[in-house]
Amino acid sequence: MTTEAASMGAAGATAATASPPGKWPSARVAYYTLFVLILSTTCSQLDIAIVPYLGPAIKADLHLSDYSFSLMVGVSFGLFYTAVGIPIAWLLDRFSRKRLLALAITVWSLGTAACGLTQSFAQLFIARFFVGAGEAVNGPAAYSITSDLVPRERMPRAVAVLQIGSIGGPAITTLISFFALTAFLHMAPLHGPFGPIRGWQLIFILVGLPGVLIALLMLFTMPEPKRHTIPNQVSGVDETRRHIGGAILQVFKDYGVALAYIGRHWKVFAPMFGSLFISSLGTGAIAFQAIFFDRRFHWGPARLAGLNLIPNFILVPIGLFIGAMVAEHFTRKGRADAALLTHIIARFVGLGAMFGALMPNPWAAWALFTLMIFSIGLGGPSQNAAFQIVTPTELRGKMTALYLFMYSVVGVAFAPVITGFISTYLVGEGNLKMAIFLPTAIFGPTSLVITLLGLKPYGREVERLKALEAGAA
């Protein structure tokens, strides 16, 4: 997600829309801050990306059905996000974002490592409860900090740079999975403090512990940029009330301000929230990919991880680059809706992925799943940048938390449950292909239509904000 500070500007920014000089961090500071945020975002993605590859082994060792596996993958994660994510976002808008994020990195890293010590479904469920801190805090904090590194017209490329972390996590995890599954999956159990440590458990430990080092790096070396606001853009946010007493009531008050702002601009935000909500319901295929290929085509997780190195390390970076270039092309053409339009194009590119589960041979199925991964790289940064562009700085933590709630809770937590439920209770676990196909075929096109309906209102809102910013300069 993100971008170049003063010297990283989009080529098409005009004098009329460019932000006044001197307000933003230097290129050196912006680059280093983005580097640390990329490490943080990569770390937050590691556990999410690695669990599908470990799925067959976890299911076999703990004797889980598809539905039980989906609960472990998703619901345990979503519980923490729901309970803590919204209050944390309130804190992000008031206190040091980097300190809160460093604490969160420590919590989710130790939670990931703890997954490697569990001996039952209940223990693994509880350990993953703490891993939810990753998405609960990292997304709003990283986006909020990034938005104060560069002016609005440069946000799409800035978000594209930060997106390297979101893509880098799965890519690095795929690489780790390939070697770790090959080396450890069938090894004899080690003697652990709470019982035997099998191959999949050792991988959790190896993935989790390095996050503590990233937390220390952030805490002691990363600067936090000054917050930038547009005067009189939002009223009702108490910026001085920082004492503990009355904080809970203030949380509700401030979220009320955020919801009121969304309500006043519902033509802009309703399609954005609605489309993300609907599309997230169809993402359960991600959690079941390794199980699907293992069950239907007898491709082991190590083989799948090796093949997925191609899209994660080659196609996704290409998608990130092309997406940023497309967004800047539309910006040079004077399109105020450039970021959202780029995301829509990527969504059309990825539509064919819904048929992957129905393919009769593994190579065709894998190719279509790969198309989905490429489209995420192509349009993901623009989707996130589009939201940040129209979100007031003083509400950015709270509104980003609400927005990411749609994916982190609905997508990561409950989409796998939909797929698992269909597989176990409706079509049978021997027909997993239909359990994967049905949600993607229903929710994917529906969410795309909703996004299209919001394109014109979004463009008008960007123009309004540019006028406000020019008047405040």
Segments the model singles out, each with a brief description of its role:
Residues 162-224:
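Helix-loop-helix hairpin linking two adjacent transmembrane segments in secondary transporters
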Residues 74-89, 310-323:
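Central cavity-lining transmembrane alpha-helices of secondary-active solute carriers
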Residues 51-52, 261-316, 320, 376, ...:
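Extracytoplasmic gate region of multi-pass secondary transporters
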